[in-house]
Amino acid sequence: MDAVNACGAVAPSHVGRAALLRMLGAQPYVPVWHAMQRFTDVRDATAVDELWVVEHDPVFTLGQAGKLEHVLDPGEIPVVHVDRGGQVTYHGPGQLVVYPLLDLPRLGLGVRDYVYGIEQAVINTLAQWNILGERREHAPGVYVGGAKIAALGIRVRHGCSFHGVAFNVAMDLEPFHRIHPCGYRGLQVTSVLDLGGPSEMDTVAAALLAELARQFCFVLHPTSGWLSS
């Protein structure tokens, strides 16, 4: 399958469509998750798509396919059962998390192309620092030399996406040893910094957002303010 070219994959009438960008900073996981659910539940055909960028407090999240046996020793880090696809992963400081809240049918996108586009955005971002990112068949996400650098877990409800991608930038990777990441025993993880890339979250966020905008032909419009309760 060829890389997703948003200007070809997205419906022609929606190329260059506006999307709001919310830079949420450091946030606990659960309030952001609940806000994504509310946003998705109340949006209609006129709602503007949004991308939320966040750095979560330490948390393990267990997706719908997740098994508690893959959580080995969480210690002081909470475990939250969530409604995304996939297994268990870790979120924490130094990890860039992006939640695209998109109306996929309006963009002319199927789930497969959507997932492929997110992965391609990460791969293209890594390439800016001469890091070779790769896909793995039947295991969504992006890998470098067999180690996972970006985890992908999504949910699509009534054609609208929420949850998203978690990209390891410059973080303490020790908590990944307390789980079987994404349900795979012994799966190694890595980060942009460990591979010689930048440690600055703002630098990596700017690069990834530009690639996501390119993949899905967005024009991103930053907006201020937190989310309604």
Curated annotation (Swiss-Prot):
GO molecular function annotations of the record: lipoyl(octanoyl) transferase activity
The EC number(s) this enzyme carries: 2.3.1.181
Biological processes annotated in GO: protein modification process
Gene: lipB
Catalytic activity: octanoyl-[ACP] + L-lysyl-[protein] = N(6)-octanoyl-L-lysyl-[protein] + holo-[ACP] + H(+)
Pathway terms, separated by semicolons: Protein modification; protein lipoylation via endogenous pathway; protein N(6)-(lipoyl)lysine from octanoyl-[acyl-carrier-protein]: step 1/2
Lineage, highest ranks first: Bacteria, Pseudomonadati, Pseudomonadota, Gammaproteobacteria, Lysobacterales
Protein name, as recorded: Octanoyltransferase
Sequence positions that bind substrate: 84-91, 151-153, 164-166
UniProt-annotated catalytic positions: 182 (acyl-thioester intermediate)
Primary residence: cytoplasm
Annotated family: Belongs to the LipB family.
